[in-house]
A protein has these predicted regions:
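Structural alpha-helical scaffold elements that stabilize or flank donor/cofactor-binding regions
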Residues: 18, 125-126, 153, 169, ...
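Redox-cofactor binding/interface segments in oxidoreductases and associated redox assembly factors
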Residues: 27, 133-135, 178, 264
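Structural beta-alpha unit
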Residues: 1-17, 60, 93-132, 231-262, ...
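Glycine-rich, Arg-bearing micro-motifs that act as flexible, cationic patches
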Residues: 134-152, 173, 265-287
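Short, flexible loop segments at boundaries between secondary-structure elements
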Residues: 161, 286-296
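Small/aliphatic-rich secondary-structure junction motif
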Residues: 2-78, 156-159, 170-240
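Hydrophobic alpha-helical segments and helix pairs
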Residues: 105-166
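A short acidic, glycine-rich active-site loop
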Residues: 76-92
């Protein structure tokens, strides 16, 4: 491993005097217990960017117990009424949390939306936001999850997606780790993260297996991206590793760096979803213990 501060291979780029902002942040919630934390996290981002904050509550798949599958007539109506009542109660609690966050952070533009998990409008809502925040999936496959929503948004929305960890804690994004391999996806992720990078105190660029990818990285891997990031005002360091499991190295380095956010491109060996979410992307998608911004 080697480490260096932002190299100076060329004239440094002058630091920008004004910070770029996100215009609209959209956060998805459902009936999971970490809704308060993900709403808080989105609220912090909205406050710092002066952004409009939209919360979309995705109504969960009704959980049907074995006895309920045999319900008929009055019994089935009672089951439906009970589930509707539970859903209304959950949504009311989430909305109260959302409205409290909007008030505490002085967010002047906000909106609450409620959609069925199967509605085609769920994904459409994400297409026009500057940043989308959603809980990352768990291997447990909870029935309350909109099926494959997080993966689908990363794959096809064309928007930067922050995957918030289950049971995560909301905090301001001040330390950012970038998984950098100089691919189109990584370039897109860094560009999408500029409003966050511009507010960071420290940024680290992690490059793995750079010797095999010199054609993409140039003479000194990480030098040019570090120079451009330094212009945003943050302290930038570059870490170079000759080899290793990229996904696990990203996650372990995020812990070592005390990162508040990991930024990376989502990529794979095929456009098929099963293969796209293999390798590095799949490791991070299901195992990250910190928020991860993915772009593709």
């Amino acid at each position: 491993m080697s480490q260096c501060t932002a190299p100076n291979l060329a004239e440094p780029i002058p630091r920008t005097s004004s910070k770029p902002e996100l215009g609209e942040i959209l956060v998805f919630t459902d009936n999971r217990s970490e809704a308060a934390s993900i709403l808080e996290f989105a609220g912090l981002l909205a406050e710092e960017n002066g952004a409009r904050l939209i919360s979309v509550f995705t109504q969960p798949v009704p959980a049907v117990t074995p006895p309920q599958t045999f319900a008929r007539g009055t019994s089935i109506r009672k089951v439906i009424e009970e589930q509707d009542s539970q859903l209304e109660s959950i949504e009311a609690r989430h909305r109260a949390v959302f409205e409290d966050i909007v008030r505490r952070y002085g967010i002047s533009r906000s909106e609450w939306r409620s959609l069925s998990h199967w509605s085609s409008e769920v994904a459409v809502n994400a297409y026009y936001a500057d940043l989308v925040v959603i809980s990352r999936p768990e291997r447990t496959g909870q029935m309350s999850d909109p099926p494959g929503l997080a993966e689908s948004l990363v794959l096809s929305s064309g928007r930067p997606i922050i995957l918030f960890p289950p049971r995560g804690t909301a905090s301001r994004v001040r330390r950012i780790l970038i998984g950098w391999n100089a691919t189109r996806e990584a370039i897109r992720a860094v560009a999408d993260a500029v409003p966050l990078l511009a507010r960071a105190d420290a940024v680290e660029v992690l490059i793995v297996d750079y010797q095999r990818q010199r054609a993409r990285h140039g003479q000194e891997p990480g030098a040019e991206i570090a120079r451009r990031l330094a212009a945003l005002g943050a302290q930038v360091e570059v870490q170079r590793l000759s080899s290793g499991d990229v996904g696990h190295l990203l996650l372990s380095q995020a812990v070592a760096f005390r990162a508040d956010l990991l930024v990376m491109g989502a990529y794979g060996h095929s456009t098929l979803r099963e293969r796209l979410f293999g390798g590095v992307t799949r490791t991070v998608l299901y195992q990250a213990g910190l928020p991860v911004l993915m772009s593709r």
